[in-house]
A protein has these predicted regions:
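An amphipathic alpha-helix signature
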Residues: 27, 81, 99, 103, ...
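Helix-turn-helix
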Residues: 2, 22-25, 29, 33-67, ...
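Short helix-capping/turn signature of helix-turn-helix
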Residues: 62, 121-126
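Hydrophobic/aromatic-rich alpha-helical bundle segments in the mid-to-C-terminal region
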Residues: 116-121, 131, 135, 153-199, ...
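N-terminal intrinsically disordered/low-complexity leader segments
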Residues: 1-21, 32, 208-219
Length: 219
């Protein structure tokens, strides 16, 4: 396998931070198996077989099956947080930044749906320490979206009575895309991202706005 590993349904996930190649192959195999069968129904033998390796080879790189899930969850949440943080810290009005945050977050959950299903829906399989670490990342994800909504409310751009509840609704809407998105369906990840960005702007009472002008535009 190359650095750009292929997972279920033609999805491409780089996993460039996972080395050496054997560890990467095992992680990709674990993503596929967990997404297809669920964490508890998957054995280390299943994972090793998908990677074309022996069960003993798995333990050279990962002490337990849970360590694999923790690694997948950590990388996935780090990427999700980076996507939202980039949008939140970008140029533009709160509406423009919220649209970018939602659009990007949805595109990731659609385009990386196999990974996202494992990252988002296997939290309870982690042990207490690993779960606490991932929950802390989820609180940061929540804070990025909530911060944009708070700015929009403060500026009068958004009409939101319950910021906490609205933040939860926005994130739930985005995350659920990983559950139903089908690469053979009628919409691409970009199209679903644009649709959901528009829906969320309506949810917060904002008018749809054009993206911010590129930096250095002299107009």
């Amino acid at each position: 396998m190359s650095t750009a590993e292929e997972t279920t349904g033609g999805e491409i996930e780089p996993w460039e931070e996972v080395t050496p190649d054997a560890a990467r192959r095992l992680l990709v195999a674990a993503v596929e198996a967990f997404a297809e069968r669920g964490y508890h129904a998957t054995t280390t033998r299943d994972i090793a077989g998908r990677a074309g390796m022996s069960p003993a080879a798995l333990y050279i790189h990962y002490k337990t099956k849970e360590e694999l899930l923790h690694r997948i969850s950590r990388i996935g949440h780090d990427r999700a947080l980076a996507i939202l943080r980039t949008a939140a810290e970008g140029a533009g009005t709160p509406a423009q930044r919220l649209a970018e945050a939602v659009g990007s977050f949805v595109r990731w959950h659609a385009g990386r749906r196999t990974t996202a299903r494992v990252v988002q829906y296997e939290l309870e399989a982690l042990g207490p320490d690993a779960r606490a670490e991932i929950l802390a990342l989820r609180r940061q994800v929540d804070a990025e979206v909530r911060g944009i909504i708070e700015e929009g409310v403060a500026s009068g751009e958004f009409d939101v009575l319950d910021i906490h509840g609205t933040t939860l609704a926005v994130l739930s809407l985005c995350i659920d895309v990983a559950r139903w998105f089908n690469v053979d369906g009628p919409r691409t990840p970009d199209e679903v991202g644009a649709l959901y960005a528009d829906l969320v702007l309506r949810m917060v009472g904002a008018e749809k706005q054009p993206p911010p002008a590129p930096a250095g535009n002299g107009s």
